[in-house]
Design a protein with these regions (language model features):
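ATP-dependent carboxylate activation and anion-phosphoryl transfer catalytic cores
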Residues: 234-313
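Active-site nucleotide/adenylate-binding loops and adjacent lid/helix of ATP-dependent enzymes
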Residues: 1-7, 49, 92-185
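Short beta-strand-to-turn element immediately C-terminal to the catalytic PLP-Schiff-base lysine
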Residues: 116, 154-159, 192-195, 265, ...
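ATP-binding N-terminal substructure of ATP-dependent carboxylate-amine bond-forming enzymes
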Residues: 1-101, 105, 117-132, 308-313
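Hydrophobic beta-strand scaffold residues
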Residues: 36, 81-82, 110, 141, ...
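Short, flexible, mixed-charge acidic loops at enzyme active sites
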Residues: 70-77, 214-221, 277
């Protein structure tokens, strides 16, 4: 059986994607006799896929093309089975304001937020728009691109003077910025895995960064973040977090695996932040840590998802 692991691409998260792809490929080789091919994504990809005719593809691309559904649309058009969510579900999950709205409509708590394109600030005047957002959302707030991951372009704003620079940083990664109320509490990631009996939440991962927010450096530099898996939460609160992640997985129509990021406030209430259709698989990533806490093998689980994808066709 030939399996192609797609990683890399041109997004700002290229390096993380390559690290995730290498780890998945290594785990698959150790757990199976599959022929595992690691492949970057460039203008030669489609020709290579047609020549290789793989039995299955595992997209491990982060950011645009990998998580916005575009590549998966192409794989579907080529009738190549792949692990992960279909394109339509990816588009819903990748757009943070859309995902927040859908989850809010499903009864899930999500912080108050405003999403505005760069053009609005030019047309209406940056100072007036920023003042209106502050009145609506309040401080502190976090600014982040509406599309993208790894906390690239994210900044925490404690006072109005920090707001303009935070917006500039966000617009460097996306034309639309999300300005979201900052909920203080415990940061938790809930990984969801599809099983023969349905989606299951894995042991929760609690994230304690040395920096103020769980930014790119804190995510991918060893020693900059402390992890607790399972999270140091009561059974009831942990179940509440798992329920939110399972709701996100279902409402957005996700498939195979996902990871939902939450904040648990002082009252034990989980607040939905975002969901990832291509969870990171690096040495410091949360999905593999939750798998390990459940005494599950990354290679064996991925192999099972490959077999399921092939059966789906």
């Amino acid at each position: 059986m030939q399996v192609v692991v797609l990683a890399g691409g041109l997004s700002p998260e290229r390096d993380v994607s390559l690290r995730s792809g290498r780890r998945i490929a290594k785990a698959l080789r150790a757990a199976t006799d599959f022929e595992v091919i690691e492949s970057d994504v460039d203008a030669t990809l489609l020709a290579r896929l047609r020549a290789q005719t793989p039995d299955c593809v595992i997209p491990v691309l982060h950011g645009a093309a990998g998580e916005d559904g575009a590549l998966r649309d192409v794989l579907q058009s080529l009738n190549i089975p792949f692990v992960g969510s279909i394109a339509a579900a990816c588009r819903l999950a990748f757009d943070k304001p859309v995902a927040k709205t859908l989850l809010s409509n499903a009864g899930v708590n999500t912080p108050a937020a405003v999403a505005l394109p760069h053009s609005t600030f030019r047309e209406l005047g940056a100072s007036e728009v920023l003042a209106a957002v502050l009145d609506s959302v309040g401080l502190p707030l976090i600014v982040k691109p509406t599309k993208g991951g790894s906390a690239l372009g994210a900044a925490l704003v404690h006072e109005a003077a920090q707001f303009p620079a935070a917006m500039v940083g966000s617009f460097a990664y996306s034309d639309v910025a999300l300005m979201e109320s900052w909920v203080q509490g415990v940061e938790v990631a809930v990984s969801v895995l599809e099983t023969p009996t349905g989606p299951k939440a894995l042991p929760l991962a609690e994230v304690v960064p040395l920096s103020e927010i769980y930014d790119y450096t804190a995510r991918y530099t060893a020693g900059t973040t402390e992890f607790f898996v399972p999270a140091r939460l009561s059974a009831d609160v942990a179940q509440g977090c798992a329920d939110v992640a399972l709701t996100a997985h279902k409402v957005l129509g996700l498939r195979d695996w996902s990871r939902t990021d939450l904040i648990v406030d002082a009252a034990g209430t989980p607040w939905f932040l975002e969901v990832n259709v291509a969870p990171g698989m690096t040495e410091t990533s949360l999905f593999p840590q939750s798998l390990a806490a459940a005494e599950l093998s990354l290679g064996e689980i991925t192999a099972q998802l490959v077999r399921t994808a092939i059966e789906r066709g």
